Amino acid sequence: MKSGRFIGVMSGTSLDGVDVVLATIDEHRVAQLASLSWPIPVSLKQAVLDICQGQQLTLSQFGQLDTQLGRLFADAVNALLKEQNLQARDIVAIGCHGQTVWHEPTGVAPHTLQIGDNNQIVARTGITVVGDFRRRDIALGGQGAPLVPAFHHALLAHPTERRMVLNIGGIANLSLLIPGQPVGGYDTGPGNMLMDAWIWRQAGKPYDKDAEWARAGKVILPLLQNMLSDPYFSQPAPKSTGREYFNYGWLERHLRHFPGVDPRDVQATLAELTAVTISEQVLLSGGCERLMVCGGGSRNPLLMARLAALLPGTEVTTTDAVGISGDDMEALAFAWLAWRTLAGLPGNLPSVTGASQETVLGAIFPANL
């Protein structure tokens, strides 16, 4: 069973940067050693946003984007190696999630697509890469997501305390760690995605820092109720979603009925949408004693306050409080999933994704034969 230093690379639906984490991993523990966040050029970010919202590309443009993202991920890894004075030979493997550009796990031909050429990463770092983690689960009838609940269970489950882990990235997803029950997990709906899209269009800001805009506005209750009527929110688990569904076009369709509203009121309403949809799912799942929050949304003071208010009797905290950086959680999870793949261990949980069986995930791109 391979153990040693692994690197995890994650670029999520928020597109707020490439998260890179260095960790020592074996069958007994995961110890984070270092991390960095690598910027995504505005041109690349816009290209990804365009394809996620259905804009057509030529095959040449798509191929170029795949290559450019692969090179970006490699640059991020090499920056971390340089910072830590490490060589390629010091790393067992890289677990790279890739950039999701489409996720459609239901229908006649279910599929998910993450790009960022792993061959580019191998060629530019000299390190074996494990990637393409989601499609095996979909091939076995699963949603292909979320995959992180297995990692949450390995690190954060408690023998007696009812716990849930909430990741608020572009999409919010919940891991149910309930003693005596199979691990559960699913996407609750939009996390930061709609809030970020709105303030980007209205004020040219990548996100609402410290929820300043949202706190200056008032929740528009009719708009909130209109958005809450979306069928995704009442759909039973297993379920997963992404930017191809909850995007700026989705928001525009709901705003057509509310012309002339104050942009800050819309921002406040979107924050409330995220808080309400999460809290409703926590309660529908039986509630918990402790809700541990990670991802960019854990730094949104309004979201954290609203979750605490909507979940009385639940301790709402961040994963940082239990020693795991909320910013690095997902990248760390994919380093761990790479370790499991190389060890021949399953990485999915059928109780979460709905797959017909457990399976080893991903494809291996070896640096050396």
UniProtKB/Swiss-Prot annotation:
Q: Name one Pfam family in it.
A: AnmK
What is this protein for, i.e. what is its function? Catalyzes the specific phosphorylation of 1,6-anhydro-N-acetylmuramic acid (anhMurNAc) with the simultaneous cleavage of the 1,6-anhydro ring, generating MurNAc-6-P. Is required for the utilization of anhMurNAc either imported from the medium or derived from its own cell wall murein, and thus plays a role in cell wall recycling.
The pathway to which it is assigned is: Amino-sugar metabolism; 1,6-anhydro-N-acetylmuramate degradation; Cell wall biogenesis; peptidoglycan recycling
UniProt record similarity statement? Belongs to the anhydro-N-acetylmuramic acid kinase family.
Supply the gene name. anmK
What HAMAP family does the entry give?
AnhMurNAc_kinase (MF_01270)
Q: Which SUPFAM superfamilies does the entry link to?
A: Actin-like ATPase domain (SSF53067)
Gene Ontology biological-process entries: 1,6-anhydro-N-acetyl-beta-muramic acid catabolic process; amino sugar metabolic process; peptidoglycan turnover
Query: Reaction catalysed by this chain?
Result: 1,6-anhydro-N-acetyl-beta-muramate + ATP + H2O = N-acetyl-D-muramate 6-phosphate + ADP + H(+)
Q: Mind listing the GO molecular function terms for this protein?
A: ATP binding; kinase activity; phosphotransferase activity, alcohol group as acceptor
Chain positions recorded as ATP binding sites: 12-19
Protein's UniProt name? Anhydro-N-acetylmuramic acid kinase
Task: Specify the domain of life of the species encoding this protein.
Answer: Bacteria
- Segment forming the signal sequence: none
Q: What is its EC number?
A: 2.7.1.170
Q: What is the taxonomic lineage of the source species? A: Bacteria, Pseudomonadati, Pseudomonadota, Gammaproteobacteria, Enterobacterales
Name the UniProt key words of this record, in alphabetical order: ATP-binding, Carbohydrate metabolism, Kinase, Nucleotide-binding, Transferase
